[in-house]
Amino acid sequence: MTKVLVLYYSAYGHIEAMANAVAEGAREAGATVDIKRVPELVPDDVAKASYYKLDQAAPIAKIEELADYDAIIVGTGTRFGRMASQMANFLDQAGGLWAKGALNGKVGGAFTSTATQHGGQETTLFTIITNLLHFGMTIVGLNYGFAGQMKLDEVTGGSPYGATTITGGDGSRQPSENELAGARYQGRVIAETAKKLHG
């Protein structure tokens, strides 16, 4: 059975919600799915004072586990148009896997969130995708089979490069049904692609 890892970092819960939707989509395709998060780098007292969502159910990932999966779908909020340092720090530890070619041929994808419509969604996706390409992975985005990314009747995330959500400057906006549908779609397509490639 196809094994999929949804690997994420979420400070305020928006990416956690998107990760759960990505996982739902992958499960719809018949994959076995694990949802894991990367370690927090912000000290606990600072995270609490900043109202970080610290009660997330997903276990902490270990770098050596990445080789166990057929597909890895990576999500993180943006930090100035790039992936959050927590995710970058985790992926930077994959040098040993890279040196062995342990991730070559695996399927990868990316999803993100920004505070505003033009807050760096696509550049953040590119920073994730660039890492995955260097690992030797085959990238699957959010193709136009998902018609929701063409919507003009509401503010919505979504890009051919990956599922996205818009949080609002104060973080009060939660992922919309359309954005969650995009995440589910991407998860399903990635799992289907991994099944075709890896059986």
Swiss-Prot record:
Keyword Oxidoreductase appears in the UniProt entry: yes
Coiled-coil portions: none
**GO CC annotation, single:** membrane
Q: Residues that bind substrate, according to the entry?
A: W98
What range(s) does the Flavodoxin-like domain occupy?
A: 4-190
Q: Which keywords does this Swiss-Prot/TrEMBL entry list?
A: Flavoprotein, FMN, NAD, NADP, Nucleotide-binding, Oxidoreductase
Q: Which cofactor does it need?
A: FMN
Query: What GO terms are given for molecular function?
Result: flavin adenine dinucleotide binding; FMN binding; NAD binding; NADH:ubiquinone reductase (non-electrogenic) activity; NADP binding; NADPH dehydrogenase (quinone) activity
Q: How is the cofactor bound?
A: Binds 1 FMN per monomer.
Query: Which PANTHER family would you find in this protein's record?
Result: FLAVODOXIN-RELATED PROTEIN WRBA-RELATED, FLAVOPROTEIN-LIKE PROTEIN YCP4-RELATED
Name the record gives this protein: NAD(P)H dehydrogenase (quinone)
Taxonomic source organism: Bradyrhizobium sp. (strain ORS 278)
